[in-house]
């Protein structure tokens, strides 16, 4: 069946080449037109399904507590005398607290408040927060911390002292060193964070002339959005740069521009059609899908290079190009089909992961591989068959020149292949032992792998985002956020149930029914306040003594239930928050925590003496309720609802972390789990995590588990395919040998050198599987074919280290060196992909050429019997 299909395709390609050109051009133009619809997505939230429990809860928490994604603008004041070491000199350093510095901060704050997309009422800065003090008559006093920029040092010192008295601001809004201040900028849409950050940078650049101030902007939203902007630019640079490098390398090998144009057309058409289809079908371009072009480029030219290599060797002047190319493609069809199917299977296995962007990446790369195979099978024969005799003559003069005039590249390639041949055929036993040792060490290295990621680390160390992240996390408690949400899950009796169960005299039955109707009215709402008002109204009526007493008892029980239902106004429960914070304050990974207890302590202090001795929690529910009621008379009453819900049954503890590494967040989660294991929450209280730092841990855990399942599944699928396609169990095992060694070595090296296992590295396993098996299939298929012709094992290997080994080496070099431009990328994931792509290609080719001959010789009784 395959023979008939390939014959028809080759007839169409060589006889109706213009049809092939027209069809390919139409597909490319149509898909290229779809790219105008591109949407960039760098939100790590989308690494989880929209209905994933952790993501749903995180978004519920943001809505419930009015928490918004925020940009952090930080400013650091250079010390007045960097070389000063004596105490007197240091004491004169006011740091950020000078009139000029505070005026600059106020100016930037006012600009931020007027920036489109900023939630102005929630901006936190010296200019927008309250100073909580005790008035002259002992009353609680709320005044703006910095209603206007100070004009004297005395006023600046007052602000410094005021902030030092407010633990909720110290370490968050101002550093304990007095050298830095922060502005927290909540935004309506995290996708606007880069634009807002750029507006702020532009204002600072144009309006702040104070050279002693260093301004920084960071935060996960701006890091993610800025990565998206730079990723878009990188997409436009990396793929063409890689294509250019591949083009140059192909010319070095084939010395014919006309000939090597063909594989480049295949690669570019594959990339454009695949990316156009992805965008046209409505998928966003995530960090992974942005690399589709980079991954497809090498795979798309692999088959073309094999065809060109064999065509160049077979074609002689005077022969018909269409006949030669037909023979070549028929000869290579089976190994090319096998490699395409197995490579596609490797990437399709990524669809088994629970990470949507990785699923999309795997689906489109797998489809792109099959598309490249189809284009290669039709376009390359059409192209070569239409080459002019003059162009083919030039090809021959370049490739079949006399040995004395051979090009340097041929000499180097032949020397390399000859060296590999010598090693492979003369040191079989030593090679097998060496690779066994390397594999054993690599397995140990795999167990040393540290799973970790951090979107900020996607930038190079000298990038402004990384510089800002390092500087601000050194000065402040932390720019990374996580939330512990504690909730009372006990079901409360409704107001209607309380009324129904109340012991009332029969004379109040009619009143009870009327009140129940009111409570059941959807407009009135079923709540205790409505019931309390109804009882109050009834008490003012003309009542008998038993009616009056019964209603009074009901009102008392309502008041009692209202008090006890407000879980986080109960002293023990608020103390629970304080105890948790005290524990976390002893952990180096946690910079600072804030909760409802901090609000209560500050207000309680100022309601009493104003001294630190009264910075404590009241010991009764009414006293706590009073402090919270007083706080709501501040300029920012909405801040209370960032920490507790209006019914006081759900509360939030805000953790500030100085590290956004998933590894560190995982350790914090374990610390809290251990704490609650030793300090059990009261019955009915439960806790859950939310926040960006936590979500990153969740999706990475999913990714690791998913990638392991994907890799194992793909390995089994490819092995079964190899056995079926090669029709031999022993050849199936041999085909998997280079793949297994390469994957083991690559990931072992990652563990040994201490490179974090992150998202780009995780998906490279699929590429390793696809490309490693490619070389092995070509080697085994050609070895079987040559053995059938020669009947001699030694002659088979001698022939294998001629054109087949040269083709494998040429392919490996083209792909490995073709991606060196990625090493110059400003974004770390692209650098990672470049390094590992090159390593995978080099190692898999080397293992194929060294290990397979040794293994085949060792097992020759079975291998060549089946051949």
Model-assigned labels for residue ranges:
Residues 419-618:
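Juxtamembrane segments of multi-pass membrane proteins
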Residues 2-243:
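Membrane-proximal extracytoplasmic
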Residues 235-237, 264, 316-353, 707, ...:
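Pore- and gate-forming transmembrane helices of large, multi-pass membrane proteins
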Residues 232-285, 352-356, 708-754, 758, ...:
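Interfacial segments of transmembrane alpha-helices in multi-pass membrane proteins
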Residues 149-256, 570-579, 583-589, 593, ...:
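Extracytoplasmic
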């Amino acid at each position: 069946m395959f023979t008939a299909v390939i014959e028809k395709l080759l007839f169409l390609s060589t006889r109706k080449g213009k049809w092939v050109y027209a069809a390919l051009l139409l597909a490319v133009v149509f898909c290229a037109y779809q790219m105008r619809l591109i949407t960039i997505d760098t939100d790590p939230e989308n690494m989880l399904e929209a209905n994933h429990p952790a993501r749903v809860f995180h978004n519920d928490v943001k809505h419930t507590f009015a928490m918004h994604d925020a940009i952090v603008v930080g400013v650091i004041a250079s010390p007045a005398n960097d070389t000063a070491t004596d105490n007197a000199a240091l004491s004169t350093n006011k740091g950020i607290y000078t009139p000029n510095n505070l005026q600059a901060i106020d100016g930037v704050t006012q600009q931020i408040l007027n920036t489109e997309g900023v939630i102005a009422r929630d901006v936190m800065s010296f200019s927008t927060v309250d100073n909580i003090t005790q008035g002259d008559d002992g009353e609680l006093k709320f005044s703006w911390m910095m209603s206007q920029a100070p004009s004297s040092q005395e006023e600046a010192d007052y602000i410094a002292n005021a902030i030092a008295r407010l633990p909720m601001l110290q370490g968050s809004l101002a550093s304990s060193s007095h050298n830095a201040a922060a502005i927290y900028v909540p935004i309506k849409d995290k996708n606007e964070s880069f634009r807002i950050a750029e507006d702020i940078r532009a204002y600072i650049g144009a309006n702040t002339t104070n050279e002693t101030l260093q301004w920084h902007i960071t935060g996960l939203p701006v890091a993610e959005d800025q990565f998206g902007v730079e990723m878009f630019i990188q997409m436009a640079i990396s793929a063409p740069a890689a294509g250019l490098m591949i083009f140059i390398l192909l010319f070095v090998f084939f010395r014919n521009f006309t000939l090597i144009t063909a594989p480049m057309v295949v690669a570019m058409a594959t990339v454009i059609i695949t990316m156009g289809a992805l965008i046209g079908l409505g998928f966003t371009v995530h960090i992974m899908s942005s690399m589709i072009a980079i991954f497809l480029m090498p795979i798309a030219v692999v088959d073309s290079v094999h065809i060109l290599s064999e065509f160049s060797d077979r074609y002689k002047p005077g022969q018909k190009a269409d006949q030669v190319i037909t023979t070549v493609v028929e000869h290579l069809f089976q190994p090319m089909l096998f490699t395409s199917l197995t490579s596609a299977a490797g990437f399709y296995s990524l669809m088994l992961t629970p990470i949507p962007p990785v699923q999309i990446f795997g689906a489109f790369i797998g489809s792109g591989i099959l598309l490249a195979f189809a284009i290669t099978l039709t376009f390359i024969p059409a192209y070569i068959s239409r080459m002019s005799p003059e162009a083919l003559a030039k090809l021959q003069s370049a490739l079949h020149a006399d040995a004395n005039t051979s090009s340097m590249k041929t000499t180097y390639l032949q020397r390399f292949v000859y060296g590999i041949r010598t090693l492979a055929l003369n040191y079989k036993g030593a090679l097998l032992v060496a690779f066994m040792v390397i594999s054993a060490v690599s397995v140990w290295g795999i167990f040393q792998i540290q799973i970790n990621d951090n979107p900020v680390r996607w930038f190079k160390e000298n990038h402004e985002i990384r510089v800002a992240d390092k500087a601000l996390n050194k000065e402040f408690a932390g720019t990374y956020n996580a939330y512990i949400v504690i909730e009372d899950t006990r079901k409360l009796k409704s107001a209607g149930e309380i009324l129904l169960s109340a012991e009332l005299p029969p004379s109040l039955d009619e009143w009870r029914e009327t009140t129940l109707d009111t409570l059941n009215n959807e407009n009135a709402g079923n709540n205790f306040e409505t019931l309390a008002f109804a009882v109050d109204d009834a008490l003012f009526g003309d009542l008998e003594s038993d009616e009056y007493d019964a209603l009074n008892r009901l009102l008392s029980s309502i008041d009692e239930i209202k008090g006890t239902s407000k879980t986080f106004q109960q002293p023990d429960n608020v103390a629970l928050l304080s105890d948790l914070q005290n524990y976390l304050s002893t952990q180096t990974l946690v910079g600072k925590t804030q909760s409802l207890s901090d609000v209560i302590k500050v207000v309680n202090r100022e309601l009493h003496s104003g001294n630190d001795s009264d910075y404590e929690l009241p010991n009764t529910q009414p006293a706590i309720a009073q402090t919270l009621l007083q706080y709501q008379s501040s300029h920012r009453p909405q801040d209370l609802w960032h920490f507790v819900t209006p019914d006081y049954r759900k509360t939030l503890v805000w953790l500030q972390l100085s590290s956004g590494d998933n590894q560190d967040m995982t350790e914090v989660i374990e610390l809290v789990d251990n704490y609650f294991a030793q300090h059990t929450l009261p019955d009915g209280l439960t806790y859950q995590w939310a926040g960006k730092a936590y979500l990153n841990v969740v999706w990475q855990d999913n990714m690791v588990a998913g990638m392991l399942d994907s890799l194992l599944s793909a390995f089994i699928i490819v092995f079964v395919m190899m056995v079926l396609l090669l029709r031999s169990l022993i050849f199936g095992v041999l085909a998997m040998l280079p793949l297994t060694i390469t994957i083991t070595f690559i990931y072992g090296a990652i563990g040994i050198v201490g490179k974090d296992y992150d998202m780009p590295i995780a998906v490279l396993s699929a590429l390793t599987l696809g490309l490693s098996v490619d070389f092995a299939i070509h080697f085994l298929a050609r070895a079987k074919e040559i053995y059938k012709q020669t009947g001699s094992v030694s002659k088979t290997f001698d022939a294998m280290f001629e054109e087949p080994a040269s083709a494998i080496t040429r392919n490996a070099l083209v792909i490995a060196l073709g991606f060196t431009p990625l090493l110059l990328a400003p974004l770390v994931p692209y650098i990672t992909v470049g390094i590992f792509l090159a390593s995978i290609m080099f190692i898999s080719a080397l293992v194929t050429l060294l290990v397979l001959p040794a293994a085949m010789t060792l097992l020759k009784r079975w291998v060549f019997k089946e051949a």
